[in-house]
């Protein structure tokens, strides 16, 4: 499913489908900016009219969907209630959900991953000790590595059978020592890959359905965390009690869902594949 489909499901579960609003203002032939009464504003949910004529975004106006500020290129003419905007106000915009989904992928990167195999990107280089693996997308860790001992060979030889190799995750480099004595021999890398982050809500959600529950709990936690902060600002603005602590219940809900996210992840996350152990021959690592 697309990320937008997943977001719409989250909206239903979190009761954030949005509230229809309509704001009207008086044009005066000089004012360019008109603030919406409620925000943030859901993407593609708004219509702006001046004197009953629908205006075109970018050409006639711009809208900051986070702050609700409507800005015209040219000031609307004078009139009573002749400027209007119909829109849907939400707690989270689609882009907010997209950002948090990507944060969840980072949060669970060592709990949930994909196994992947690369057989075309790398070849051996004579006397080269390190191989930069940054061209492999979303790589987390190298589990095993092979190469073909001769051009045209159909047999993959495990690299650790003849030489030592080690992967350094922070540098994203594979170190081989001693290096290969020949160049241009195909290499095969078996690695763990993280889920692909979305750059637009139209992208396909890369998280498998069987692993979605802890990700949803994480998103719930972030949702209520922000809601708690909003409640603090709203209630704090109207109270001066020195011992006032705003919205503890909302923040407790956020903490509860974060705990549920961790517990669910620990229950259903896959086991890491076994890592190769160095072979010993006559007391020497090979």
What are the language-model segments listed below?
Residues 1-20, 73-75, 79-115, 154-286:
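Internal mixed-charge
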Residues 4-72, 76-79, 89-92, 98, ...:
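Extended beta-strand solenoid/passenger and fiber regions
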